[in-house]
A protein has these predicted regions:
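Positively charged, low-complexity/disordered segments
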Residues: 176-186
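Non-heme di-metal
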Residues: 1-173
């Protein structure tokens, strides 16, 4: 039988991070709506994609919990939904804290308490969170430099709906055939 997490600091860390990931999922869903309303289709899609990834992280953390009531003390962002730029800045800061501080610390505690699989989970999720931060910071830069819809040099753009691809420096405002929005094609 596997060692129990009941009553350990690891159990509290699992619940704390589960709550944080669950809340991040919901914030990113709200942020996606704002981005879509502001015309940032690609950013909205990335917020939605990241929200789904945060759900998966929360699921991985939740599966290690063994039931019952666990008391935790934690701080979480409280409720402001701003512009897309402000939301990206908040999201990047939260991701940075997770990958650089929270999850490495939680992994160390899990190792100390004899839970190497949980420690590995935290280290792996930290890698994903770092990628989330980097992606958000790239979008921040694009908004701040007015390069969301225009790039230097030729860029391959793809319609987000029908997949039609073309090359030029500026985004078409709507798709050639289906009238949907475009984003850089990677």
């Amino acid at each position: 039988m596997a060692k129990s997490v009941k009553g350990t600091r690891t159990e509290k860390n699992l619940l704390t991070s589960f709550a944080g990931e669950s809340q991040a999922r919901m914030r990113y869903t709200y942020f996606a709506s704002v981005a879509k309303k502001e015309g940032y289709e690609q950013i909205a899609a990335i917020f939605t994609e990241t929200a789904d990834q945060e759900k998966e992280h929360a699921k991985r953390m939740f599966k290690w919990l063994e039931g019952g009531m666990v008391e935790i003390t934690a701080s979480y962002p409280a409720g402001v939904i701003g512009t897309t730029l402000e939301n990206l800045q908040e999201a990047a800061a939260g991701e940075h804290e997770e990958w650089s501080l929270d999850y490495p610390g939680f992994a160390d505690v899990a190792d100390e308490e004899g839970f190497p699989e949980i420690a590995l989970m935290y280290r792996n999720i930290a890698i994903a969170e770092k990628g989330h931060e980097e992606r958000y910071r790239a979008f921040i830069k694009n908004i701040e430099t007015a390069s969301v819809f225009a790039k230097e040099g030729e860029v391959v753009w793809q319609c987000r709906n029908c997949g039609f691809i073309y090359t030029r420096s500026e985004e078409r405002r709507v798709g050639k055939e289906c009238r949907s929005r475009w984003s850089p094609y990677h």
